[in-house]
């Protein structure tokens, strides 16, 4: 088995960008969902499922520079932490974020048609489950077969896609450790999914009917699950093409 895709977004909800490698620390992928947008009126982190047009934008954080590409503008600079914090709701969990000064909030407010604030999050603060997520090509192929149209890896927004022939091998990884490149992770649980998985990863418009397919064959405790999440137990760099090793497997 090997890593066939790696990716993340530096701004929660923006387009999930494929990358040649990902650096993992004990807090998770470096640069992943480091920033988020906050709705100051409602006191909560902006939700992708309610704002799918965010996928029409990309956010890259490289060497301290945040570059956001919107349909009609590119906004780039070094984010300035203001020292002002906001404690807001993130899917029923209270998180404390630091407000960021710069042009990004204005650009996104104009794009979304509502006032938003850009904030910086701590590691894992605006991640629904554990910091790393995995899917397998075998599982994506099975979901595509059931949907009747190809499901793109980017629709599932996972940190890593692992190439496998059989579907849902990842179910057997729960509670086990995996080696990926220089890093090691421990798989925690299956990932509950929402209708974001059916959106076109570049436009945010409806593309597939995967959630309904999961409801038919991947229902667990009232949730529709696909892929697994994991914590990092050993930091390191993971490249596309790196071998994936299951601890204890022959």
What are the functions of these language-model segments?
Residues 1-250:
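Metal-cofactor-dependent catalytic cores
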């Amino acid at each position: 088995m090997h890593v066939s895709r790696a990716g993340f977004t530096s701004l929660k909800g923006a387009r999930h960008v494929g990358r040649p490698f990902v650096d993992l620390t004990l807090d998770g992928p470096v640069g992943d969902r480091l920033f988020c947008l906050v709705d100051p009126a409602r006191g909560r982190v902006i939700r992708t499922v309610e704002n799918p047009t965010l996928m029409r934008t990309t956010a890259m954080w490289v060497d301290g520079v945040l570059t956001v590409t919107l349909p009609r503008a590119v906004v780039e600079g070094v984010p300035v932490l203001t020292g002002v914090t906001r404690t807001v709701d993130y899917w029923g969990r209270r998180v404390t974020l630091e407000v960021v000064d710069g042009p990004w909030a204005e650009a996104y407010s104009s794009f979304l048609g509502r006032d938003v604030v850009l904030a910086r999050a701590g590691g894992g603060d605006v991640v629904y489950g554990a910091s790393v997520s995995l899917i397998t090509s075998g599982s994506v192929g099975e979901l595509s077969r059931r949907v009747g149209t190809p499901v793109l890896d980017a629709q599932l927004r996972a940190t890593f896609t692992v190439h496998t022939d059989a579907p849902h091998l990842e179910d057997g990884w729960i509670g086990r450790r995996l080696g990926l490149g220089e890093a090691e992770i421990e798989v925690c649980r299956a990932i509950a999914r929402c209708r974001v998985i059916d959106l076109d990863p570049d436009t945010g418009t409806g593309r597939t009917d995967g959630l309904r397919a999961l409801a038919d064959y991947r229902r667990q405790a009232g949730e529709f699950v696909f892929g697994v999440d994991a914590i990092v137990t050993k930091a390191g760099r993971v490249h596309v093409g790196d071998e994936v090793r299951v601890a204890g497997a022959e």
